[in-house]
Amino acid sequence: MADLSSPDGDPTIRTLLRHVLDTADSHTPRRRQSTQTNPQRRRSQTPYSKRQGSQRKTSTRKHSHGTGSVGRLARVQGHGHLEEQTPRTLLQNILLTAPESSTVMPNPVVKPAQVPEVARPSRRGSSRGSLELQLPELDPPSTLAPGLKAPGKRKQKLRLSVFQQEVNQQLPLPQEQRGAADGSSLASSFNLSFVPSVQPQTVDRPGLARRRPVRRPVNIGAFLQNLENKSLTSALPGDSHRTPVAALPTDVVFEDTQPFSQPLAGCSLSVHHSLPNPSQTEVEDAERVVGPRTPSTGTRPQSQMSRAGFGASPLPFSEPQPQSPELREAVGSKEAEEPKDLEGSSGDEETSGMPASRELSSSAQDLLLAEEPHQLFEPPPSPGVAAVSSESVPAKLPSRTRTAQPRHHQDPYKAGLSHYVKLFSFHTKMPVEKAALEMVEKCLDEYFQRLCNDLEVFAAHAGRKTVKPKDLELLMRRQGLVTDQVSLHVLVERYLPLEYRQQLIPCAFRGNSVFPAQ
C-alpha cells in the first residue's frame, strides 16, 4: 500500500487490479457450495434444458473466436461453464481490455486526435443471471498489406461527399482518404460540399453524354427561290400570255393576295396586247348576255376602272420586246370574233324579249372563260407602248366552273314494273328465284304495253283524248273477264283483297270523300 500513496506511482485501474489479484485468495469461498449444488441441478435438469445448455455453449464458443483477446477469454471459459466464473477471471478480463493511460494523472504528451473506432459490445451473463456487464471488444491493429482485407472486417463504404469532391478534382481516390471517409457521422458532416459540382469537360464514357440537337440555319434565299420555282411550275402550260413570278418584285407579288384585286398605282400587272380593246357598248352587251350566272360579274367595274385609270401606265420593271406578226394576227382574230358573237347573242335576246336560255348562258360563259380570261381582269395597253413578252402574271386565276351534269332520272314505267314484281313476290309467300322474277317482269311489260295500246285505241275511236272506265270495261269484255253474268264489281270483289274492296266498292256505288258519286 506504500506505493499506492506515493505521488510517483501510477494509480491506474490496471495497477489497482493487479494489487487485488496479488492479495486475494486464489479460490473463491463459494466454489465448494457451487460444486455441491451442481449434482442437484443435474438431477433437476430435463433433456430439454440440457439441449438448451449445449446450444448455449456452442454459441458462446463461436462468438469468442476472431481476435487475440477473445482467444484468451475462450481459454478461460473452456475450463468451466459461464455460471462458474470467479471475480478473478472477471478482473483478468478487465486487465486485458483496460487502457494503459491513467485516469487521475493523464499523460503530458498531447497526441493527435484520432477518430474513435466503433466498438462492438458483447454481453456476458453472470453466474445467476443477475449481473450484466457490457465490455467493448476492440479489434487488434491489423498488420496486413493495404490491398488485403482483414478476416471478419466489414466492407468500407464510400461517402457521397468524398465521391463528389473526387469527381470535381478528377483525381483517383487515395487510400488515406478512403480510411478517413469511414469516420463517424459527426466528422463526415463537416465534409459536405455546398458548392455545386462542376461538370467535367471530358467525359470518360461518351455514350452517356447527350448529343446536342443539330440546328440547321434557314437559308432565306433558297426558300424564296423554291417559292418562285413552285409558282413557275403551277402556271398553266398552254397559256402564253402570262409572266413568271421571278420577273416581278417580291413585295408586289406578296401584296397582291385578294382575288381579282385592283392593280397598284405604281405598277401594272396586266398584259399589254398590240390591238386595242373592244368598245364599251360591246362589253356591256356581253355582261348583259352572261347576267348573274357568271361568277366574275362582280369584278367587271374593277376591270373598267383599271382600264380607265391605269391603262396608260407602262410596266416599270419590264422592257418592251418585239412580238411576231403571226402571234399578233392570232390574238387580233380572237379579239375580233368575241365582240361579234356577244353582240349577236345580245341582239337575239333583245328581239325575243325573253330571258336567255340555260344553254345560251352556259355557252356564252364558256366562251368568255375560254377566250377572254385576260381581258376581263386586265386594263388595255397604251397605244404608244409595245407589247411585252408572251408570259405575264395575272392578278388572280378565275375559279374553275363546274359543268352541270344531267341527273339520272329513273323511268317511271320501269319503277312501276319493279313495284308489281315486288307485289308478286310478296303474295306468293314463298321464295322466288331471280330468273322467275325476270320472267314475271317481262310478262307484265308485255301485258301493260298491250293494255295501254288497246285503251288508247278505244279512246281514239270514241273521239276522246282521255281514257275512261268504260274503255277499260269494254276491253275487259273483249278479253272475256267481264260478262253479263260477272260484272266489274263482282270481279273486283272476287280478285281484290278486302282493304282494296273497302275503298273501291263504295266508290263504284255511291262514292266517298275521295271519289264522289256522279
Swiss-Prot record:
The modification Phosphoserine is found at residues 313, 324, 333, 345-346, 357, 382. One of its GO terms (molecular function) is protein heterodimerization activity. GO terms for biological process: cell division; chromosome organization; chromosome segregation; kinetochore assembly; mitotic cell cycle. Residues 94-381 are annotated as: Flexible stalk domain. It comes from the Eukaryota. GO terms for cellular component: chromosome, centromeric region; inner kinetochore; kinetochore; nucleus. Residues 34-57, 294-306 have a biased composition (Polar residues). Residues 19-28, 326-343 have a biased composition (Basic and acidic residues). Pfam families: CENP-T_C, CENP-T_N. It is found in: Nucleus; Chromosome, Centromere; Chromosome, Centromere, Kinetochore. Keywords: Cell cycle, Cell division, Centromere, Chromosome, DNA-binding, Kinetochore, Mitosis, Nucleus, Phosphoprotein. SUPFAM superfamilies: Histone-fold. Signal peptide: none annotated. Dynamically phosphorylated during the cell cycle. Phosphorylated during G2 phase, metaphase and anaphase, but not during telophase or G1 phase. Residues 384-395 have a biased composition (Low complexity). Coiled coil: none annotated. InterPro entries: CENP-T, CENP-T/H4_C, CENP-T_N, Histone-fold. Its main location: nucleus. Residues 1-70, 102-156, 271-362, 375-412 are annotated as: Disordered. The modification Phosphothreonine is found at residue 86. Component of the CENPA-NAC (nucleosome-associated) complex, a complex that plays a central role in assembly of kinetochore proteins, mitotic progression and chromosome segregation. The CENPA-NAC complex recruits the CENPA-CAD (nucleosome distal) complex and may be involved in incorporation of newly synthesized CENPA into centromeres. Part of a nucleosome-associated complex that binds specifically to histone H3-containing nucleosomes at the centromere, as opposed to nucleosomes containing CENPA. The largest part of the sequence forms an elongated and flexible stalk structure that is connected to a C-terminal globular domain with a histone-type fold. Belongs to the CENP-T/CNN1 family. PANTHER family: CENTROMERE PROTEIN T (PTHR46904:SF1). Component of the CENPA-CAD complex, composed of CENPI, CENPK, CENPL, CENPO, CENPP, CENPQ, CENPR and CENPS. The CENPA-CAD complex is probably recruited on centromeres by the CENPA-NAC complex, at least composed of CENPA, CENPC, CENPH, CENPM, CENPN, CENPT and CENPU. Identified in a centromeric complex containing histones H2A, H2B, H3 and H4, and at least CENPA, CENPB, CENPC, CENPT, CENPN, HJURP, SUPT16H, SSRP1 and RSF1. Interacts (via N-terminus) with the NDC80 complex. This is Centromere protein T. It comes from Rattus norvegicus. The gene is Cenpt.
